[in-house]
């Protein structure tokens, strides 16, 4: 990927990076959050972002 990106593309990539994390272990251990995980997780190779 080239380094010449617009500010809009950079912010969208940063946003996607933040959203691609799993739910913290301490939160999953709580009673209300049993069996909960991040369904929106994506792998960089299998699912591409539509930002361009």
From Swiss-Prot:
| Keyword Acyltransferase listed | no
Alphabetized PROSITE patterns for the sequence? RIBOSOMAL_L39E
Q: Does the keyword Ribosomal protein apply?
A: yes
* Gene Ontology terms describing biological process: translation
Key words, A-Z: Ribonucleoprotein, Ribosomal protein
Q: Tell me a GO cellular component.
A: ribonucleoprotein complex
InterPro entries of this UniProt entry?
A: Ribosomal_eL39, Ribosomal_eL39_CS, Ribosomal_eL39_dom_sf
- Which pairs of positions does the record mark as disulfide bonds? none
Q: Which Gene3D superfamilies match?
A: Ribosomal protein L39e
Which molecular function GO terms apply here? Answer: structural constituent of ribosome
Q: How does it assemble?
A: Interacts with YIH1.
* Family according to the record: Belongs to the eukaryotic ribosomal protein eL39 family.
Q: What is this protein called?
A: Large ribosomal subunit protein eL39
Q: Which organism is it from?
A: Encephalitozoon cuniculi (strain GB-M1)
């Amino acid at each position: 990927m080239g380094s010449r990106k617009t500010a809009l593309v950079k912010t969208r990539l940063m946003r996607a990076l933040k959203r691609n994390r799993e739910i913290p272990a301490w939160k999953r251990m709580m009673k209300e959050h049993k069996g909960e995980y991040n369904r929106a997780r994506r792998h960089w190779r299998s699912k591409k972002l539509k930002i361009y």
